[in-house]
Every structure is written in C-alpha cells, then in structure tokens.
C-alpha cells in the first residue's frame, strides 16, 4: 500500500526514464523544420555525411542520434506517408540503447524499429531484425525497404524458402537483414559446419532488434535449435513399448502428475511391464533403453493430446507450438518422444536423430554485441529479461489513451455451461453487427466452438494452426461488421485489426477469451487485439472449473465459493477476488516455466563454453593465414607419449622390460609407418621417445615433400577439420546421454548440475585428447602421390577406358553389319577370326557344327 502511494507521488523508475526520453525527443522535434525544407537529394546527402563521419570514427552513434532520427522521420513522411510520433521517437531511443520497448498493439512498432536500424546501420556492420514468421519478415522488409533504400541502405530477407548458400550470402551482405529467429539460429549452426570461411553466410553479430521479443526470447527459449542426423537405432522398440503402455491401467499400474508432467510406474506396473517386454528386470543396464521407451510411450499416451500438442499432417506428427498455436514444421521432440507419438498414432516411425550441432535461443542471441527488443507485453517477464539477457524493459505510453474496457472474468462450474454462455454472448453481439474475436487455448477447443456456432447458424471464420497460410488475411477482416473470428493463441501477431467509424459507434472489437492461458502475457496479447490507437473495445474471459489452469494449478478457494453459493445451471460468479485467484494460479505456472528455462540455460551454459572453444578453434583452422605447424609438432609428441603408455613403456621402467614388439606393432598400426627394431633397442625412455619422434617427423616430411607448402597446409587443415567435426559430433551424443540421466544423481544427495559440470568437463578433456591423437593418426596415415605417379595413373585409366570404348565400338559395328545382311550371304573362312569378336578362329567358335552361338545364332 505504502509502495503504491510512493509511486503515485514520486513516479516509478520507468516514468522518470520516459520523461528524460521525451525531453530528448523534443530536441529531435526542433530539427524538423531544418530538414523539412530540404530537397530529397539534399536530405540523402545530409544522411550520407552523417554515415561517413561515423565510419571514419569522427563521431559516435550517440553524437548523430538527433540528426539521424530527424532525417529518418522526414524521409518516412516522404516515402511512406507516415510521421513518427513523439512516443515512437522514445521507442527508437530505447531500442538504440539495447533495451526492450513495451508498446501496445497498434502503436507502430515496425515504424519505431526504422529509427534504431537506420542509426545503427551507419557502422556498416549489418543490423538484424528478427520476426516470428516468414510472412512478417517479408512484409516488413518490403514495406520498410522503401525507406531504407531512400537512406542509401540495402535490405535483405532470410526465409525458409532460400535454399542456396549463395542466395543467403547475398541477403546477409545487405545493411539491414530481416528474418526469423529460427533461420538466423540455424544459419549460425550451419556456418560452423562449413569447410571454408568464404562459404559462411553470417558475417557478424553486431546489433539485433527482436520483434515480439517475449515470444522469441521467453516462450521459445525452452526449445533449443538442433541440427541432427540419423542415429541408427531400432525402431521396433517404439511399437512394442506403445503396446505395453496401452496394456497398463492408470492408478493401478502408473500415476500421472499433470502439474509436473511426470508419470511413475507402481510396483505392480513394473511387474506388468516386465511381463509385457518378456524381461526379468526392467531397470537393469541391458534393459535401460526399454524402460526409457516405455516412459516416453506413457507420456505420449497420457500427457500429449492430438489437436492440442500436435496434429497429424500428411501422415506425419507435427508439433503445435503451445504459445503461438502455430505448426512447428520440421521440428521434432527429442529423446524418442516424437517416435513414441508416431507409434501411438500408427503413422510411419521416423528414425531417431543424433545431435550434430545445437544452441539455445538464449545463447544465440547473447552472441550479439548489442540486443534490443519490442513487444506489447513484456512487463510480466521483466525480471527474466534482466536476469538472463541483461535487457531492461521500458513501458512506453500510448500515443492516444486506451479506451478498451477489460471486464472481470466470468467463472462457470462446467465447460459445457461456459461454452453455452459464450455462444449466447456471440449471438447477442452478432445481432447488432459488433465484430467478435474469440480466443481459444487449443485447436481442439476452436473446432468445438466452430461446431457449436455452425449449429446456431452464425457465420464465422476459424484461425488455427491448420489455416496458418491464411492467417494475415483472416485476422485483417476480424474488425469488419458482423465478423466472428475464432483464433488460437496465434491471433495474427504483427497484423493490425482495423475498424471503421460504424464499428466504433457499435463499441469496437469485442474480445472473448474462452480459457486463461498459463501465461498472463498470452491473455494480454489477446486483449491487445482490441482498442488500438484510442479505438473503443471490450474484453472478457469466460472460465470453468474444468479448465486445465484451474483444475491443475488453481486454489480450492474458487471451488469452495461456488459450492457455498449453490449456483444453478448456467449461473456464474464474477468478482475481483476470483480474477486475482486466477492470476495467482498463472503466476505459479509462470514461475515454474521460468525455473524450467533457467534450468535449461544453466545446463546449456556449460555446453556453450565448450561450443565457443570448439568453434573458435574451428575458425582458426578455416583461416588460411593461421599456421598450425607448431600445433602438429606439439601433438606429435603428445601422441607418442600416449602410444608409449599404451605399450606399457613408462618413464622410470627399466629398458630391459620394454616390450618393443608390442610398441612396433602399435606404431605401425597407428601411423602406417614402419620402423626397424634395431633403431629402438637399448635406448632409455627419453632417447626412445626422441628416436620415434625424429623417425615419424622425417617420414611425414618425406611424404609431404610431394606437394608444395600451400597444398601441405590445406591438407593439414582439412584433416584437422574432419577429425574435429567427427569428435565434436560424438561428444554431443555423449553430452546428450549425460544430460538425460544426470537428474537421477539427486536421489544420491548430489546436485545434478554440479555433477553435470564435473562430468562434462571430463568429457571435454577427453574430446581435446581425442582430437589430438586422431588428427595425428590421420595425418601420418595419409597416402600422397607424386605428380608423375598421378599422371601415370591417369594415363592408365584413360588407356583402359579407350580399350573399353574400342571393344564396345567393335561389338556395335559387328552387330550393325550382321543385322543388315542375311545369314546366307555371310562368307567367313574356317580359319579366319570369328566375327563375333571372341578372338577365336571361326571353326572353333561360331563355325562349329551343332547349334550356332554368338552373333550367328538363330533368333
């Protein structure tokens, strides 16, 4: 209470910051008259001179901010017909300073971004603008591209339909690049699998502005980006595990904890499962894979629902993003869960994959020197943005006061009563022509509502993951007279719902939420579809005690109130107390999800340090000017020390005890280089090591003398890269396995994260050693040919090919000759070579008595 009073009197930190920004915006306004009178050419020239002063280092971006913003605003007026409001200038400054601008729907975030983009692109390092889908990336690049072009900037777009590296490289070479978070992230991973620096498409990570920043950095942060390949594991086990899972009974054989999304087998369930699999101990080491498959099969059948968590599309299981409601094409659940869902639905089971490269969005976006974001809903997650990304959220006032009325929630006992009330409300609004946007939490619920509206013969449009392609078109029309639009969470983010004067007089767009989402932000986004730029509107949520949020996370307080009131069929309760109880349930879930994301990040931070070290080394190998000869020298010695250890030849051991035969066998096998025993006999440890090192180096130098110095370096770098990539892939597989089982250490009173850090460090040391030894083995085993040998080999191949062609031509000619002459006219002497080309005399081949053979045989 006291805190709220203090805020009212003195203002919040946010209010004070906005006040300072407004004062700075006034200075930009003072420059407006100066640039208004300039011709287009003079305006362009003024901007170019600012750019040059920044690139020469004469001025900083902050020095030219006022002029840059003033010129960008004037250019926007001329080419787009849009002038930035003062609050939009504030938003531009917030973005430039690497913060998050929270701006309500319809406040023109796309236009705000142009101010920060135009300023930061002056450095010539490239600016990335990240959007949630390809449609928005293309739309914004096209619409804003006219402005950037006027200012002398090139614009690129990175979308899923760009397949070639050359096309992507061309787009990334632009001053301003629009694209989706997935495309930027995957390009980074693919770049770090390339074998040449020139093939890399992403050149820098200087500055990124993330549109709908909450959706990308919060909602999608639990899903890492993974490039994978086949893991070659048996697929039959998934079908067997699914049939065993279906034979088990809930409560009797297993318990389901929906809150924590965990399924546990009972003692009786374990026995039943062992019977189903035909094994004695489900949890023995040899059956570990079966217990894992069963766990995933139970989850697939009891925690994942079709048309809510996934859909079947063209015979494939496709994930539905729980926050956006969109289909996540190409994305698959990991750890065998996707295969378990395929077994459950009876579709083709695709091979389980092995990670080749991965990164979380948290760690990808932290690569940027400067990061900023914008969204309509960020304050509820302000602490997470600050903790994880060091991004401060600034709420920017609307240009016009929001007129939308946000009404209290209505709570019904059952889902049936709730939907009946929703239909009645839609009917009432539809009769007077007021447009309605109905938000649902899943495809299943949107299709239920669709069938109820059909029964009532109310015309409507459905927008869910199954109509993704028509999304923008459908959402644009949601503000028309009499429009009834049912939408899942996607609700066309980034697309404005505009209304005309007639709709304003009817009360504007009416929002009905049929369920509270686990996150308050998603509810606020739905509300934000109405009341843009001072338009009237209203929003209300209809809930029931059967909704997932209230059933799993809600307190008993609401249920007790409803029981005491003894509500009749169709009656509801509506009060601020109930709305607050619902928000408390949401806060619980948000807190749980935050812990989950934080947990994921803590684990990925461990892998991220290793990833950075490996990628840094990889980039050094790709750099042709980087000399790795000293590394080869060091590794050769380390490799030989390891070899001596394998042969049980250790420092301090008497030389008479050395097993030289074993050492010779290992040396020849490891390096494909023979060495005589006499060279090694009677030598002490250090002398023995030096002899081996000298012999190996001499052999290597002799081999490499067949090529010039540049070719030698290329061969060394290429072999190192191949060894590094193979070892890194294997390392990622081991890290995946480690992460899967590390949670069990908690039962042994050990912190799983601490254990993971220890174990992963040991694995990383093994990786480094493995790269050392395998690269030495590959380099010394390589077979090179001299130029003369190569030419001789080529001549031999050409001669062999020539002989083959001659024989084929001879046979073809013979075929032609005999096919055009009757047999009776063929006159061949008995001692002549047989015309069939066999090389035998005619009398011993086709001229023999008896049935004819070869070309002269009767058809």
Swiss-Prot record:
Zn(2+) binds at residues 834, 836, 845-846. SMART domains: SecA_DEAD (SM00957), SecA_PP_bind (SM00958). Its cofactor is Zn(2+). It is found in: Cell inner membrane; Cytoplasm. Keywords: ATP-binding, Cell inner membrane, Cell membrane, Cytoplasm, Membrane, Metal-binding, Nucleotide-binding, Protein transport, Translocase, Translocation, Transport, Zinc. It comes from the Bacteria. Disulfide bonds: none annotated. Its EC number is 7.4.2.8. One of its GO terms (biological process) is protein import. GO terms for molecular function: ATP binding; metal ion binding; protein-exporting ATPase activity. Gene3D superfamilies: Helical scaffold and wing domains of SecA, P-loop containing nucleotide triphosphate hydrolases, SecA, preprotein cross-linking domain. May bind 1 zinc ion per subunit. Pfam families: P-loop_SecA (PF21090), SEC-C (PF02810), SecA_DEAD (PF07517), SecA_PP_bind (PF01043), SecA_SW (PF07516). InterPro entries: Helicase_ATP-bd (IPR014001), Helicase_C-like (IPR001650), P-loop_NTPase (IPR027417), SEC_C_motif (IPR004027), SecA (IPR000185), SecA_DEAD (IPR011115), SecA_motor_DEAD (IPR014018), SecA_preprotein_X-link_dom (IPR011130). SUPFAM superfamilies: Helical scaffold and wing domains of SecA, P-loop containing nucleoside triphosphate hydrolases, Pre-protein crosslinking domain of SecA. GO terms for cellular component: cell envelope Sec protein transport complex; cytosol; plasma membrane. The keyword Ribonucleoprotein does not apply. Monomer and homodimer. Part of the essential Sec protein translocation apparatus which comprises SecA, SecYEG and auxiliary proteins SecDF-YajC and YidC. Part of the Sec protein translocase complex. Interacts with the SecYEG preprotein conducting channel. Has a central role in coupling the hydrolysis of ATP to the transfer of proteins into and across the cell membrane, serving as an ATP-driven molecular motor driving the stepwise translocation of polypeptide chains across the membrane. Belongs to the SecA family. This is Protein translocase subunit SecA. It comes from Wolinella succinogenes (strain ATCC 29543 / DSM 1740 / CCUG 13145 / JCM 31913 / LMG 7466 / NCTC 11488 / FDC 602W) (Vibrio succinogenes).
